[in-house]
Amino acid sequence: MPHSTADRRLRLTRQALLAAAVVPLLAGCALVMHKPHSAGSSNPWDDSAHPLTDDQAMAQVVEPAKQIVAAADLQAVRAGFSFTSCNDQGDPPYQGTVRMAFLLQGDHDAYFQHVRAAMLSHGWIDGPPPGQYFHGITLHKNGVTANMSLALDHSYGEMILDGECRNTTDHHHDDETTNITNQLVQP
């Protein structure tokens, strides 16, 4: 899935909005949330004390994406993988992120509920993990958060799957998204 200027702007806008919404919440919850994190880190989602390799971080989000595509029988899927910094400096730790678009069939609200139901039947939990807030339909499972919304082209839905902040490799200068469409679509 090649990056276009519009895709980059959308991603940066979403990240900025998410950061603006999450930072005040994390600041207030950091002292009461018990979650292992790196010594000296003030980010409760940073579990880099138990790091994931690049391959593990990628598998953490690619495997669930494959399952979702199959379970919901998503059509015309396009998908890309990248590493996303878990802080606003672009420094480690990173999380694996899958962004996928899929063709909406019929009413988008009804179709999103179809996808949601398929995910719930495969063990996903409705809503975001405790302490996280998203717009759109959000589910989580095994450290992965999936958020669904309309894509810019309203004939498509978009799902973003984010893994845990446990990859400590420096991806600061990685600007590439790896096309993983063929890994998600069954021949």
From Swiss-Prot:
One GO term describing the cellular component: plasma membrane
Lipidation (N-palmitoyl cysteine): 29
Location in the cell: Cell membrane
Signal peptide residue numbers: 1-28
Keywords: Cell membrane, Lipoprotein, Membrane, Palmitate, Signal
Lipidation (S-diacylglycerol cysteine): 29
Bilayer disposition of the protein: Lipid-anchor
Highest taxon of the lineage: Bacteria
Protein's UniProt keywords contain Membrane: yes
Name assigned to this protein: Putative lipoprotein LppJ
Biological source species: Mycobacterium tuberculosis (strain ATCC 25618 / H37Rv)
